[in-house]
From Swiss-Prot:
Keywords: Actin-binding, Allergen, Cytoplasm, Cytoskeleton, Disulfide bond, Phosphoprotein
Modification comment: Phosphorylated by MAP kinases.
Motif (Involved in PIP2 interaction): 84-100
UniProt keyword Transport, yes or no: no
InterPro entries, A to Z: PFN (IPR048278), PFN_euk (IPR005455), PFN_sf (IPR036140), Profilin_CS (IPR027310)
Molecular function per GO: actin monomer binding
Quaternary structure and interacting proteins, as annotated: Occurs in many kinds of cells as a complex with monomeric actin in a 1:1 ratio.
Entry GO CC: cell cortex; cytoskeleton
Entries under PROSITE patterns matching the protein: PROFILIN (PS00414)
Sequence similarity: Belongs to the profilin family.
Note: The variability of the residues taking part of IgE-binding epitopes might be responsible of the difference in cross-reactivity among olive pollen cultivars, and between distantly related pollen species, leading to a variable range of allergy reactions among atopic patients.
Protein name: Profilin-3
Annotated S-S bridges: C13-C118
Amino acid sequence: MSWQTYVDDHLMCDIEGHEGHRLTAAAIVGHDGSVWAQSATFPQFKPEEMNGIMTDFNEPGHLAPTGLHLGGTKYMVIQGEAGAVIRGKKGSGGITIKKTGQALVCGIYEEPVTPGQCNMVVERLGDYLLEQGL
């Protein structure tokens, strides 16, 4: 299965039990910042934004004072799982990033999708990739 198929079929799909509700944007990005696959709507990000995200995984709390920036959008960092998941909020939407052995699984949402639904979609794929040694 191609990385693009993972994005299209497992991240940008309808949310279980909520037909028509789906993430706004999603991507799978290598730890080095290289994009493995992304939705057409995923924002173009700067290398320093991805560096900041990777630093926060290695040093939890790094982004808390400044916020998480991706594609020029600033998200307020909310409770995640140290070293495993970073969650951010901006208005009625937000972002979830799950770290696997080799990649970051990213999902961005807006209402009517809820933070919990975004977490479920992103973390389910991230957990699967971890199980596969990726």
